[in-house]
Regions:
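The feature captures the catalytic groove of carbohydrate-active enzymes
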Residues: 51-67, 99-163, 171-216
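Carbohydrate-binding/catalytic loop surfaces
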Residues: 14-26, 51, 63-71, 75, ...
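Non-catalytic C-terminal accessory modules of carbohydrate-active enzymes
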Residues: 160, 228-366
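Alpha-solenoid helical repeat scaffolds
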Residues: 26, 67, 71-74, 87, ...
Length: 366
């Protein structure tokens, strides 16, 4: 992730070298949990709005404008900079107005092409369902920001848009990406999303970008150990092939009879880099340093260390560890007041002993 934080948050340093707003949500979640309040965040958000003034969609993709709203609210909760929301007031509220005009009374949208991630792109019905859930999620966060900005009329508009969207029933069509977003947005019970979609086949059907939201859906259903097993299998599969950075795309099937990236390809084996990839990144065009795949880093801070932000700027946090089969976990969590130091150890009776040191200004609640 750090390699892609060069003044701006790029995805990725090898090829695109562009500020992709959708890619940025796993990235800013990771940056916030590892590096803290980082200037590249503000530079990237400002640049995106300058490059794509309303009524244009950010990066030419309406989904990435939805991610803009989600990212803004998420970062506000982490670091509490209301003045930055004020700086972006016109863009945030203008985007609410633009989206409102695109949603009809039956919950259908006229926002152009729908996109989640590349591996899902051939499942049109599933992508439509996931995009619909992304719209609901974005409107929920836009409503919260409208209230923070003192604009009750816009907040009401967000509620009305969400109500219209909820009138339409969508089908994930077997797509894990869609079911995960539907669980997060409250359009599907997390237990159903995991039982019928996300958990089916374990890591099969996971993707580097949307795998983060699949892990989040599993956590919502209390399936922490299962999520950690999938991290070990899927992202661990990259490590087994010699990865030292997050890859743009990955399929466990690629590892069959493939050589590692840190050695010459043995005769008779596949080149894990040159022989795979897909869509716009076949072969050596495939990026092996892509921040959108970093979701497990953020996920482990939130669910293994167990840090939940309850009040903007980390003024109040709850810490609830989920160790799975781990015997211990240790780490830090950045806040505007300094780092929270955390260590969890499993006792012989299975209970967990926690040692937590929080800076002044951060209240840890049970």
């Amino acid at each position: 992730m750090h390699l892609n934080m060069q003044e701006y948050i790029w995805d990725g340093i090898k090829r695109d070298r562009l500020v992709w707003l959708g890619d940025m949500h796993p990235e800013t979640s990771t940056i916030g949990n590892v590096f803290g309040d980082e200037e590249s965040f503000y530079a990237s958000m400002d640049l995106a709005c300058q490059q794509y003034p309303l009524p244009a969609w950010i990066n030419g993709m309406s989904a990435y404008s939805l991610w803009y709203l989600i990212i803004q609210y998420d970062w506000y909760m982490r670091f509490g900079h209301k003045e930055y929301l004020e700086k972006h007031r016109d863009y945030i509220l203008g985007l609410v107005d633009l989206i409102d005009k695109c949603i009809d009374a039956q919950g259908n949208d006229a926002m152009g092409a729908h996109f989640l991630d590349w591996p899902s792109s051939t499942n049109t019905e599933g992508v439509d369902a996931g995009y619909h859930a992304l719209l609901v999620w974005a409107m929920q966060d836009a409503q919260r920001m409208s209230i923070l900005l003192g604009d009750e009329a816009r907040a009401q508009k967000c509620r009305e848009v969400e109500d219209r969207l909820r009138r339409k029933v969508v089908n994930p069509n077997g797509l894990k990406q869609a079911a995960s977003l539907m669980a997060i947005a409250g359009l599907m019970d997390p237990a159903k999303a995991c039982r019928d979609y996300v958990s089916v086949g374990g890591p099969k059907g996971f993707s580097t970008f949307y795998g983060y939201y699949m892990l989040e859906a599993l956590a919502m259903d209390g399936r922490y150990e299962e999520a950690m097993d999938i991290i070990s299998q899927y992202w661990g599969g990259m490590l087994d092939m010699g990865a030292t950075t997050f890859w743009e795309d990955f399929d466990l099937e690629w590892t069959r009879n493939a050589g590692r990236i840190d050695d010459f390809v043995p005769e008779g084996k596949k080149d894990i880099h040159g022989d795979f990839g897909a869509y716009c990144y076949p072969g050596f065009r495939h990026s092996f340093c892509h921040g959108w795949a970093s979701g497990p880093t953020a996920w482990m801070s939130t669910h293994v260390l167990g840090v939940e932000i309850l009040e903007a700027g980390c003024k109040r946090v709850r810490i609830t560890p989920h160790l799975g089969r781990l015997q211990w976990a240790e780490g830090t969590f950045p806040t505007p007041y300094g780092q929270i130091s955390i260590r969890h150890e499993r006792r012989a009776d299975g209970s967990v002993k926690s040692s937590i040191k929080a800076p002044k200004g951060v209240k840890v609640v049970k």
